[in-house]
From Swiss-Prot:
Pfam families (alphabetical): VWA_CoxE
The keyword Chaperone belongs to this UniProt entry's keyword annotation: yes
Assembly and binders: Homodimer. Interacts with RavA.
Protein name: Regulatory protein ViaA
Subcellular location: Cytoplasm
PANTHER family: PROTEIN VIAA
Species this chain originates from: Escherichia coli O6:K15:H31 (strain 536 / UPEC)
Family, per entry: Belongs to the ViaA family.
NCBIfam families the record matches: PRK10997.1
Protein's job: Component of the RavA-ViaA chaperone complex, which may act on the membrane to optimize the function of some of the respiratory chains. ViaA stimulates the ATPase activity of RavA.
Keywords of this entry: Chaperone, Cytoplasm
Superkingdom, taxonomy of origin: Bacteria
Record carries keyword Cytoplasm: yes
Amino acid sequence: MLTLDTLNVMLAVSEEGLIEEMIIALLASPQLAVFFEKFPRLKAAITDDVPRWREALRSRLKDARVPPELTEEVMCYQQSQLLSTPQFIVQLPQILDLLHRLNSPWAEQARQLVDANSTITSALHTLFLQRWRLSLIVQATTLNQQLLEEEREQLLSEVQERMTLSGQLEPILADNNTAAGRLWDMSAGQLKRGDYQLIVKYGEFLNEQPELKRLAEQLGRSREAKSIPRNDAQMETFRTMVREPATVPEQVDGLQQSDDILRLLPPELATLGITELEYEFYRRLVEKQLLTYRLHGESWREKMIERPVVHKDYDEQPRGPFIVCVDTSGSMGGFNEQCAKAFCLALMRIALAENRRCYIMLFSTEIVRYELSGPQGIEQAIRFLSQQFRGGTDLASCFRAIMERLQSREWFDADAVVISDFIAQRLPDDVTSKVKELQRIHQHRFHAVAMSAHGKPGIMRIFDHIWRFDTGMRSRLLRRWRR
């Protein structure tokens, strides 16, 4: 069967002009005009999509099939061109019958032209073919326009859906023109209104927590600040958290003599049940001579020191992707879960604005992965935000997954971010040593976003930066009061 592209070539019909007219009409439609006025950042993104539309329309016209009636008429026209005038006179009745049978727009005019002239001359033969060709060109142009109109309606419907989605998410995820362009590209997926409303919900929550949003922005630009001390700088008071040894239930270190009843050795406790040794037990208790487990750990305390005022020179450095590990244990549920998800949404916003990648890993008893900056980023973000935090805590597996990804060529300059309350078991020595090796040799940086003030210092000391956001009730009330 004849294709429309072949027909256009045969009749010298310019499909490019028809495509350009259709695209101009689409961009000038009232729906797009209102949208461009409301969201100017997305205007450039949609305009950049025009070449793709043009190519899709060309492909549609190229693959379209010509109706059988028009195909038969074109074949008859081509055969008639090869006839001499005497041969044409002989074939003319069959040609007129064929045009009538095919309901050709040229049929009635052709018969009138023949009836108006008693003799078929060479000039009339040429005129007949010229007008027939014009009729075929009109039919081919009409067919092109019909197909383009169908495509225009379909394209307008698709663009309106994407405009609705992008318009809802633009205030949340698009910080500049780069982010707006990437957001428009990601809006091509099949999403329903109820799906992306989850992103809107967490975006609103993030706006209600400006400290959390500010923390994400500081983490995102932390590579560009370079401190330059001055000899004549004034002194300022600086508060810092320091580690110091403490007896906390973190790790059993050995045995000691004390009066700690809660950590008695079983043999000591057994003497309490023997009447002859009961007084001996109490004597050793008073003298702190009972054998107990010795605990070793570290705690944090606030220390005030004075230091010179530091002036910062912002020297732009290359910024790599984010690899974000999120703790989904039961202790991270509730408000912690909301904060962790909103923080990841803020990092996604930064990644879109700075053309970086944002890779999320959820760790509990297994690792679940999402890439929020890819072509399916919105769908991945919705799946991530739909997850519930009810698992256990396997921080070691999280670090192993991070280190495995950092060894890949495309992630060599990534920043690793771990979001947790850090109430977990101590990390194995092999994991700790590998992290230190990555920090020392490859300059990889590990960030901790601590959602609790009770995180274990033994775990957190391996991080380059610790960003604290206490989600306890007291801290939440203080933040609300300050606002």
